[in-house]
Amino acid sequence: MPVYWYSIPAQIKGVIDRMFSFVVGGKNIAGKECAIIACCEEAEMDVMDGVRIPLERSAALMKWDMVGEVLVPGVLNAGDIAKTDGCAQAAALAEKF
């Protein structure tokens, strides 16, 4: 997912809101596996905190197992991701599921 203005994109926030209804409704959704794959334009990794922290906390609330994270900074233009090991990291993370 892209990082927009140091936060989660609205589409992902909508998913979190809908999943939260299961929690407050008492539905047992524990034990799922999840991961974070995100990129941003800036070079500083702390820019990812606005995405990483809410997703980690949401996973903890739902009692999901965070399998891993791939956070790739410095990705602005088309093709920039190819200059990183982000795709290889994402492929390795996918193997954990």
Name the predicted role of every residue range.
Residues 1-62:
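Helix-loop-strand module that forms the ligand-binding subsite of alpha/beta enzymes
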